[in-house]
Amino acid sequence: MKKNKLSIKTIVAIGIGSAVFMILGRFGSLPTGIPNTNIETAYAFLALMALLYGPLAGFLIGFIGHALKDIVFFGSPWISWVFASGIVGLIIGFGARFIKINQGVFKLKQIFMFNLIQIIANGVAWFLVAPTLDILIYSEPANKVYLQGVIGGISNMVTVGVLGTILIANYAKTRIQKGSLRKEY
């Protein structure tokens, strides 16, 4: 019999992470002046959860959290952007193999790697996936959705780069580094 890949801990993290993402997405965002495009603090939290629980959990937290936010606060999900949020969590989650914050290490090398990964994740999601799906699914005008994608992507890169780095660095400080304890005589 094949072992289930999602532990109970990961499933609980997906549920709680989705709820926190939804709340941060609604109450922790600032308008940019571009219609339906905000500066979102939720993506800093998504980055932490994706690094802790991996790509599948990162995808599901971003996807479910964004879908819940849209349904609860706006009436229906905007599926192209919901999917893009999942893509951000997925790509950052793959970075967990390079950035092991559970080992208590988040120094300059890991900070650089994290920011490189999150810039790629946000670029793919907001410059490519979200606007392209907007055009394919909703027949939105290309100039509008690519402008929204660029503004949203850049603001998410900056938000995750600043808040995400601070959040992850502080989390890593709570973990004990391997070999850091010495026996006293």
UniProtKB/Swiss-Prot annotation:
<protein>
    <recommendedName>
        <fullName>UPF0397 protein CPE1584</fullName>
    </recommendedName>
</protein>
<keyword id="KW-1133">Transmembrane helix</keyword>
<keyword id="KW-0472">Membrane</keyword>
<comment type="similarity">
    <text>Belongs to the UPF0397 family.</text>
</comment>
<dbReference type="InterPro" id="IPR022914">
    <property type="entry name" value="UPF0397"/>
</dbReference>
<dbReference type="InterPro" id="IPR009825">
    <property type="entry name" value="ECF_substrate-spec-like"/>
</dbReference>
<dbReference type="GO" id="GO:0005886">
    <property type="term" value="C:plasma membrane"/>
</dbReference>
<feature type="transmembrane region" description="Helical">
    <location>
        <begin position="71"/>
        <end position="91"/>
    </location>
</feature>
<dbReference type="Pfam" id="PF07155">
    <property type="entry name" value="ECF-ribofla_trS"/>
</dbReference>
<feature type="transmembrane region" description="Helical">
    <location>
        <begin position="149"/>
        <end position="169"/>
    </location>
</feature>
<feature type="transmembrane region" description="Helical">
    <location>
        <begin position="111"/>
        <end position="131"/>
    </location>
</feature>
<keyword id="KW-0812">Transmembrane</keyword>
<feature type="transmembrane region" description="Helical">
    <location>
        <begin position="11"/>
        <end position="31"/>
    </location>
</feature>
<keyword id="KW-1003">Cell membrane</keyword>
<feature type="transmembrane region" description="Helical">
    <location>
        <begin position="44"/>
        <end position="64"/>
    </location>
</feature>
